[in-house]
Amino acid sequence: MKRPVLIGITGGTGSGKSTVAKEIYNKFDEACIAMIEQDSYYKDQSSIPFEERCKKNYDHPDAFDNELLIDHLKNLVDLNVIEKPIYDFEAHNRKEETIKVEPRDIIIVEGILVLQDPKLRELLDIKIYVDTDADVRIIRRLLRDINERGRTVDSVINQYLTVVRPMHMQFIEPSKRYADIIIPEGGHNRVAVDMMVANIKHLLQK
C-alpha cells in the first residue's frame, strides 16, 4: 500500500464542510477511504467539573488535542492502526470507548480549524476551504445543536454571538488563505465536489 492521500476540509461552523466530506467519502469504496473528524479530538476534560466544561470556548484552537490528532495522522501515513477518540457533546468530554481506524488510500480530515495549525497543515496533500454565508451558517448551527447535541435555542444563539462568530473571524476565516481550493455553497456545489473526486483519483494513480 502506498502512502495515503490526506485531504483537509475546513470552513466555518455550518458551512457544509461535513457535507462536502461525506460527498467525497461516498464517491469511493469504503475499503479505500477513512474519515477523521477534528471534533473527535477535543481535549479530555475528565478532571474538570461539568459546569466548567459548559463554559469553555470550543471554537478556540486550545480546545483541540491537535498533538494527538497529528500523531494519529502520522501513524496512518505509516500504515498503522489508530484508536480514534469518541467525543460526547452533551457531557462535553471524551467517552471511554474509541473507534479503530485502519490505514486507507484516502484519509479525510474534517473540522473548523484543520488549516489553522501549521504542523497539521503540512501533513495535508489537498487543503479545501468551504465558504458559506454567515446567515446560512448560523441557521445550520442552530438546527444541528438543538437536534443533535441537546442544546437550547438561547444557549446556541448566545454561544454564536459571544464565541462562535468572534472565533470564526479570528481563526477560521484567516485560515482560508492556506487552502488549495475554495468551495462556495458547501455540499450543494456538485461541480466542485466532482472536480475534487477527479483530482483525488488522479493522485492515487501517481
From Swiss-Prot:
ATP binds at residues 11-18. Keywords: ATP-binding, Cytoplasm, Kinase, Nucleotide-binding, Transferase. One of its GO terms (biological process) is CTP salvage. It is an enzyme of class 2 (transferase). GO terms for cellular component: cytoplasm. Signal peptide: none annotated. One of its GO terms (molecular function) is cytidine kinase activity. The keyword Transmembrane helix does not apply. Pathway: Pyrimidine metabolism; CTP biosynthesis via salvage pathway; CTP from cytidine: step 1/3; Pyrimidine metabolism; UMP biosynthesis via salvage pathway; UMP from uridine: step 1/1. InterPro entries: P-loop_NTPase, PRK/URK, Uridine_kinase, Uridine_kinase-like. It is found in: Cytoplasm. Its EC number is 2.7.1.48. It holds the Pfam family PRK. It catalyses: uridine + ATP = UMP + ADP + H(+); cytidine + ATP = CMP + ADP + H(+). PANTHER family: URIDINE KINASE. HAMAP family: Uridine_kinase. NCBIfam families: PRK05480.1, udk. Belongs to the uridine kinase family. This is Uridine kinase.
